[in-house]
Regions:
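Active-site gating loops and adjacent loop-to-helix segments of metal-dependent hydrolytic enzymes
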Residues: 1-28, 79-97
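Catalytic pocket-lining loop regions of alpha/beta-barrel enzymes
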Residues: 141-170
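Catalytic domains of carbohydrate-active enzymes, especially glycoside hydrolases
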Residues: 35-50
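Active-site gating/metal-coordination segments in enzymes
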Residues: 66-70, 74-150
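Acidic-and-aromatic substrate-binding clefts and catalytic sites of carbohydrate-active enzymes
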Residues: 54-60, 129, 158-161
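Short catalytic-loop micro-motif centered on adjacent basic/acidic residues
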Residues: 48-53, 151-155
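A short acidic, amphipathic alpha-helical/loop segment
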Residues: 60-64, 169
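Divalent metal-coordination and catalytic microenvironments
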Residues: 1, 49, 144
Length: 170
């Protein structure tokens, strides 16, 4: 299944076992469905959750805020950048200070300028761990150190995602 393929009857079995293979399975763009899921979470005793999407996979942060308000569940947002393949154009030339400035701006002014401030930093690392991703990882670690926010690293789930390299850098 290719990453740009849509969910179909022909590939649904593969996708159910490997739901990260296509962007279509990760597109949570129906606030009503999302709100029901969060309400079910609350009914099961949940009180807080971390919404871990960052640029590259981030949805509508305003909808997330509305869902949190409507359900009474605390939702902690996240800043950072996802895997290389999903990077916004500016990231391809960014240096450590640029990544840090981006994260600090979201921390201080809110995610995408909304005033909704993140409580965590997340970095996605691709298979093969590119040099630019190392810059991003170092920037995220420094930003976490300076701000006191927790850092989550999402290494590639296939072989070659670099967890040992990541640990050495951190």
């Amino acid at each position: 299944v290719g990453e740009d393929e849509k969910n179909t009857l022909e590939n649904i079995g593969i996708i159910r076992r490997n739901n990260m293979f296509t962007w279509d399975t990760q597109d949570l763009d129906d606030p009503a469905v999302m709100e029901k899921e969060v309400a079910d979470f609350k009914a099961a005793g949940g009180r807080s959750l971390v919404e871990m999407s960052v640029p590259g996979i981030r949805g509508d942060i305003r909808a997330v805020k509305t869902i949190a308000q409507n359900t009474g569940v605390n939702v902690i947002g996240t800043t950072g950048i996802y895997i290389y393949e999903s990077w916004p154009e500016w990231c391809h030339e960014a240096e450590i200070k640029d990544f840090m400035n981006f994260m600090k701006q979201e921390i201080e002014e809110g995610i995408e300028g909304t005033g909704i401030r993140p409580g965590m930093i997340k970095v996605g690392i691709s298979s093969g761990f590119r040099p630019r991703e190392e810059l991003l990882l170092r920037a995220a670690a420094r930003t976490a150190n300076e701000t006191g926010l927790s850092l989550t690293v999402h290494p590639c789930f296939t072989m070659g995602g670099g967890p040992l390299e990541i640990a050495k850098i951190l």
